Amino acid sequence: MRNIFLLMIFLSSVLAASAQGQVVQPKPTALVVSSRGELTDLEIGDQYDGEAPVTVRLYSNADEVEGYSLTCTWEFFKEGEEEPFLTRHDPDAEIEIRESGVTLIRPTIVYTSRTNSEIFWPFDSEVYEPFRIQLAESGIKVPNAFSPNGDGINDYFNVFDVKSIIEFHGAIYNRWGQQLFVWGLDEMGREGCGWDGTYNGRPVKAGVYYVVVIAKGADGIEYEFRRDVNLLRGYTEGGK
């Protein structure tokens, strides 16, 4: 009789287990999209190094399992701080990071049995290391000359050594204060973008022009440049 009773208990446990699906540990991933549209895939514990702003898309890769309720939590920390500045409760999430420094993104994934409320898989920080998003301090430089002669070198006037700039406005003027060209954040520092030394489609004369650049970095630093720029014609690299 005792053996029959034990067998019944065993069969009951097997039937209860079969009513629930099998839980497999998820492997969260992230996709970082830079302001230039560059894509970087991250696995758990990986670090991204780049410039602000970036968009981070987070994927828990956690499937719903029969017999369990699923809870996914994303906590966002600034490095060195104990309390998160943001918490999301979704299987997938997205955040734009516009501040320089290190942002830690820590996932927690929990499956809870609907039968006995037992937490089957507490995937906490000991299992999942945070994603590290490290964004450089801001910086920007403005040249004082360019040579739009079609040789592929310095053909456009634009800023350079750009790092973590989130606001930008640039303008070129002639000696009488007439505005000849303006450009913004989308063209800032990009190859093949900027002023090509023309106005209304026609080349302007060689000489001195005036540039105004106003920008703001992800670290809160504000930049303002007001200076002359020399437009050189008939000049090639090496002076030939």
Q: Model segments located where?
A:
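Append "Rare intracellular matches occur via the same short Y/T/C beta-strand/loop motifs
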Residues: G101-S113, Y210-A215
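Short glycine/proline-centered coil/turn motifs in the loop regions
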Residues: D63-Y68, V162-S164
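Residue-level recognition of secondary-structure-to-loop junctions
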Residues: F76, P91-E99, T103, Y111, ...
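Bacterial Sec-dependent N-terminal signal peptides
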Residues: M1-V24
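Short loop/turn motifs at secondary-structure boundaries
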Residues: Y48, Y59, F131-K240
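Sec-dependent signal peptide cleavage junction
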Residues: A17-E51, G239-K240
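Surface-exposed, flexible coil segments in extracellular/virion-facing regions
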Residues: E66, T71-I95
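Short, solvent-exposed loop/turn segments at the edges of extracellular beta-sandwich modules
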Residues: V110-W121, K216-G220
